[in-house]
């Protein structure tokens, strides 16, 4: 039985009329957010805007928090005067969604205990859809950085509320799902896999992002970059290293 599902490119109308009702019958609950452009559209047009969704088994988890991350808003708030950030990243309306779930005690087997000393085990599931165009490798990479940075903030706040003594980004399990629109040798995959990336990586296309990129590093705005933008998570891919024959079949 599938514990949770993460989907991208789900149309708003399809989420509310097809996916959510059908999955609720199978004991799932869900969270969905459309791309940012939906805010300025008519009700009829809004139905056809796609977004990201997360579904989870109600018998296994209780929803504690839910968050939508609009990349254009994060870009605007962290532009620091970068024209590239405003003209290339902020103009794309991709989004991500995150849920903080409490794991039901019944799921722990004999001898198993929550990671925290507190009697509550949380799990975070995050799902995002990055920009598609190969000519915008910089945008894909920065969107990924922004999302991971926002997830880190959500995780730290959830960790402090759950009674954890630290805000270690690895103190709560994280499942990160995404349509990265990126190949295995891309800066996006390098950043996620290696814990960081050089601030002069070729995927930035030599554009002037350096100052604002530090806003998304685990060192923070006042930290020392040492030429790298880092995220602090210990991520491991659920896929094999080999390139899949296809990721979309029509």
Segments from the language model and where they lie:
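Short, high-confidence coil segments that cap the C-terminus of an alpha-helix
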Residues: 2-3, 171
């Amino acid at each position: 039985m599938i514990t949770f599902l993460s989907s991208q490119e789900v149309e708003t109308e399809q989420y509310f009329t097809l996916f959510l009702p059908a999955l609720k019958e199978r004991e799932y609950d869900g969270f969905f957010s459309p791309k940012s452009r939906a805010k300025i559209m008519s009700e009829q047009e809004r139905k056809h805007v796609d977004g990201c969704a997360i579904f989870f088994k109600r018998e296994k988890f209780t929803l504690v928090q839910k968050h939508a991350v609009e990349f254009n808003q994060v870009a605007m708030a962290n532009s620091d005067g970068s024209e590239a950030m405003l003209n290339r990243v902020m103009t794309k309306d991709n989004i991500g969604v995150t849920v903080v779930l409490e794991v039901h005690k019944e799921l722990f087997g004999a001898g198993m205990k929550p990671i925290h000393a507190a009697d509550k085990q949380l799990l975070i599931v995050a799902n995002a859809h990055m920009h598609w165009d190969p000519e915008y490798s910089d945008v894909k990479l920065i969107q990924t950085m922004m999302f991971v940075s926002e997830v880190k903030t959500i995780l730290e706040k959830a960790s402090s509320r759950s009674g954890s003594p630290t805000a270690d980004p690895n103190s709560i399990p994280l499942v990160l799902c995404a349509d990265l629109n990126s190949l295995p040798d891309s800066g996006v995959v390098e950043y996620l896999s290696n814990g960081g990336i050089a601030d002069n990586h070729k995927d930035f296309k030599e554009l002037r992002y350096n100052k604002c990129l530090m806003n998304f590093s685990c060192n923070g705005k006042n930290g020392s970059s040492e030429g790298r933008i880092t995220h602090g998570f210990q991520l491991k891919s659920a896929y094999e290293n080999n390139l899949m024959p296809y990721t979309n079949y029509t």
